[in-house]
Amino acid sequence: MAASSDTGLDVTGGCLCGAVRYHAHTVNREGYYCHCRMCQLAFGNTRAAFFNLPKASVRWQGEPRYFRSSKFARRAFCGNCGTPLSFEYLESKHMDLSGGSLDEPSLLTPTSHFAIEKRVPNWHADDGLPGTRLDEHVKLTERWTQNYGSDVGVAAARET
């Protein structure tokens, strides 16, 4: 269910088994695809679909479980069925909810790709959307390098 207004969009979503639900308010209808190796493993897919919104706008019904995927980030999921629900940097006021967990995923439109150097070529269809390499996100790359060396992703998740 969704309600739209000039100031944004109210959306609902949750996990496969229904134990964890959310209601959220987003100010835009834009989503993105992440191709980083960590998201590939967390979602069991070649990419993850997300939309970004303020953490304060998300209300959970049922408690998600959290996996600390690095020293500075965590991922919410359903402890019963395992559905990936969100990604967030611990200190950020924003978070990403998974596009596939929306009750109406078609309400949002993907507008870009992130971590395009990690795209799996034989699983990628060129949709014409712009893409960003991880190393173009300087602050994130510096943070990863300081904490984990050159491995951007998998070692961090397996260390925590």
What are these regions, as identified by a protein language model?
Residues 2-14, 19-160:
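A short Gly-Trp-Pro
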